[in-house]
Amino acid sequence: MRAPATAPAAAPASAHSVEDPARYRFLYEHFERKGDRDASYRAALCLDALGEADINESLLVTTHRPEGLQPVRGTLTYADWNERLNAGCRVPEATALLRAIGGSALGRVGFQHARRKRRELELPDEARQEPEKSTTTLAKTLHWSSRLLCVPAAELYVLADLPGSLGLQPGPEQPVVACSRALGSGFSLPELVFLWSRELAFARPEESALCYFPSPDELSLLLQAALAVGGAVSMRSIEPDAKRIASGLKREVRGASLGALEQAAQRFNGSDVLESATLFTRGAELVAGRAALAACGNLELALALEQRFPRGTATKPAERRADLLSFTVSPELGQIRATLGVAVG
């Protein structure tokens, strides 16, 4: 293992500049001169969130900011996820390792790890709902978010109580969506869409590893195990917990999948596996916030919910806030909004 992975561009180096209203007013005026109405609107959203919008900027925001669900006419594409939402957050070698393991194999190995850590949650069958068929607000907004993001959510468990109100829980082959019953009251539809969309971003194939290995330390164990099974490092050189995970990978990853893992392991170029795990986790957390912002279409709401229901182990609240502000005025979000059919004309 050789050089560290490239760090994702979370927030700009100076958090102060991200909070500076002058930055967004300059952008607003620049976009107005260009005639880019959606970009002007998004710059005005930032000024409004910072409490610095003038009368014209406030009028633009109140005219176009959705009060309920966005009237979307499209869904997120592969390019939206991998080129736009993921801009500056790519950790390709760690991603390739996780992709080579494969979704169901990753789930089975991860579930055994979660059971060893006693994180398995009892999910009674009577708490199960099918989002596509259920008429509850919780299930309907989950289904709406799932379709928009193109991330499957086949079932939902509504429990009497759940720490954090909602989250992905370790399932035997893939993560399971669960929430507290209390989430069904006191939240608007856009708020539920933000929370569901942020969670579903972690249910994508590679990112689902974080449901079972939720911290950089634990994810690094999985990466060590994958490198050992792939023949890039000696089994004797990895940590004891990683060896247990490697035993599971040997049982689950065979044939063509093993060949893909061996190729990914040989291409892994990180001297510090923990650093790669940290960068992957950071990137996933930032991308989740961006996806949720794109889904709900309301920056002020996104910032408030991010503060009220923080979701991150490798990023700090100030970083996630700065990233949401920066991403709002990015060309990537403009392209996503055009794909969804919600760009201001």
List the model feature ranges, each with a label.
Residues A246-L249:
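Small-residue-rich helix-loop
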Residues P8, S17-Q174, A182-P190, P205-E206, ...:
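Hydrophobic or amphipathic, alpha-helical segments that drive membrane association/targeting
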